[in-house]
Design a protein with these regions (language model features):
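Residue-level signal for secondary-structure boundary elements
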Residues: 2, 32, 64, 144, ...
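N-terminal localization/anchoring segments of enzymes in phospholipid and broader phosphate metabolism
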Residues: 1-19
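Short His-Asn-centered micro-motif
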Residues: 11, 33-36, 65-68, 89-90, ...
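Internal, well-ordered alpha-helical segments in soluble enzyme and binding-protein domains
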Residues: 16-19, 132-136
């Protein structure tokens, strides 16, 4: 990780998972994420689903967007089962973002998610700048409005 005055550059999937975990743990109201489906498997493996469940048990809300396809049905079903609101965007890949309580965020440049592993190199940016979080949330909300509910998509498989 490289520390910068206004944020931190994240250089590995391992560090990105740690940062995302910290954002979820510190959130009190809402977490919103837009993530390629292969990253959901890694996130679950490293207990992000459990941390999300704790937030929801405390009254928080989690909304997420991914591309639902057969290899990732179980990962999405688990998120829906624990209470996350998940929507589908066909053929989504590339960047990821996670925003907690409209102030902390991590976002990436393009990621080749199918080939990703814990030690893979990435370029992502963490910041606690609320203006940047609002910018990311504006993108999230636009995609959210166009996305299809996961329950509907899951019922088609």
């Amino acid at each position: 990780m490289l520390l910068m005055e206004s944020g931190t550059i994240i250089e590995s999937v391992r560090d990105a998972i740690a940062v995302a975990s910290g954002i979820i743990e510190s959130a009190e109201q809402e977490v919103a994420w837009l993530v390629p489906a292969p990253l959901l498997v890694i996130a679950a493996r490293y207990n992000l689903n459990e941390k999300s469940k704790v937030l929801m048990q405390r009254g928080g809300r989690i909304r997420g967007i991914t591309s639902i396809s057969p290899p990732y049905l179980n990962a999405v079903r688990e998120l829906v089962h624990i209470g996350e609101e998940v929507r589908n965007v066909q053929d989504y890949s590339g960047e990821f973002m996670l925003v907690g309580d409209r102030n902390q965020s991590i976002s990436s440049m393009s990621v080749v998610a199918e080939d990703i592993a814990l030690d893979s190199k990435i370029v992502a940016f963490w910041t606690d700048n609320p203006d940047y979080a609002e910018y990311l949330l504006s993108i999230f909300e636009t995609v959210w409005q166009e996305a299809t509910g996961a329950r509907k998509v899951l019922s088609e498989f």
